[in-house]
């Protein structure tokens, strides 16, 4: 039952990565019981980061922990290879990549070749990042059987889809990436890579503790509150809202997202805080 945080990337008002804020945030997540950090994922605005920024994030977080999965995905394979080689010098958990995207009707052999190239030069374990809603490609288990895959992050609202990986790829760790499926993923998979760990890490850790104790009804009650939070965040833009809610729930500032993920206006941030306040109180009652 591993809980992995796809950490946000804090930016200042000029759009530069705030390394100090990133480190502070990572330290807090680990202190709250998060097992590992997924670097440069979707929540971390990975596809919108430059090669140098991706490298900078890894460097900064490596000062905090070695429990890192380094997401290197890009349409520029030369950049991917350079990032993988850079990470080879570090003692991290593994490297990961989303599939190629944008270009329609890529044959499966191209997807397989992309991951083969990463695995060929990496000294670390390979984690597949499957996000069909974002990339347009759903990576089938069949093309992964010949690859040295350690784990799969499956960002999918269909738990049965994640279970297909589990059933067809023995020995491969499978994590679901949906906040609304945390409870069910902890029960049936190897864990979760959930964006809500950025602002309510202790809630998700509490869910795991309750499940281990056999208190499934209590864990499910927390999931209900998480799902209600998810409904609210979608109205504002989930990733943008997370930056506001880290401060609201954890008590420190993580700056701003960067366009094309625009920060909330002051009015939107205030409205969000008001809307989640009843849920915040209920969560605090159940966790503490």
Curated annotation (Swiss-Prot):
Source domain of life: Archaea
Pathway per the UniProt entry: Carbohydrate acid metabolism; 2-dehydro-3-deoxy-D-gluconate degradation; D-glyceraldehyde 3-phosphate and pyruvate from 2-dehydro-3-deoxy-D-gluconate: step 2/2
SUPFAM superfamilies: Aldolase
Family: Belongs to the DapA family. KDPG aldolase subfamily.
Binding site for substrate: 42-43, 129-131, 153-155
GO molecular-function term, one example from the UniProt record: 2-dehydro-3-deoxy-phosphogluconate aldolase activity
Alphabetic keyword roster: Carbohydrate metabolism, Lyase, Schiff base
Source organism (scientific name): Sulfolobus acidocaldarius (strain ATCC 33909 / DSM 639 / JCM 8929 / NBRC 15157 / NCIMB 11770)
Catalytic activity: 2-dehydro-3-deoxy-6-phospho-D-gluconate = D-glyceraldehyde 3-phosphate + pyruvate; 2-dehydro-3-deoxy-6-phospho-D-galactonate = D-glyceraldehyde 3-phosphate + pyruvate
Record's keyword annotation contains Lyase: yes
Temperature dependence: Optimum temperature is around 99 degrees Celsius. Extremely thermostable.
Assembly and interaction partners: Homotetramer; dimer of dimers.
Protein name: 2-dehydro-3-deoxy-phosphogluconate/2-dehydro-3-deoxy-6-phosphogalactonate aldolase
E.C. number(s) listed in UniProt: 4.1.2.55
The protein's role, per its UniProt record: Involved in the degradation of glucose and galactose via the Entner-Doudoroff pathway. Catalyzes the reversible cleavage of 2-keto-3-deoxy-6-phosphogluconate (KDPG) and 2-keto-3-deoxygluconate (KDG) forming pyruvate and glyceraldehyde 3-phosphate or glyceraldehyde, respectively. It is also able to catalyze the reversible cleavage of 2-keto-3-deoxy-6-phosphogalactonate (KDPGal) and 2-keto-3-deoxygalactonate (KDGal).
InterPro entries: Aldolase_TIM (IPR013785), DapA-like (IPR002220), ED_pathway_aldolase (IPR053415)
pH dependence (UniProt free text): Optimum pH is 6.5.
Family matches, as Pfam families: DHDPS
Catalytic residues as annotated in Swiss-Prot or TrEMBL: 153
Residues under site feature: Proton shuttle: 129
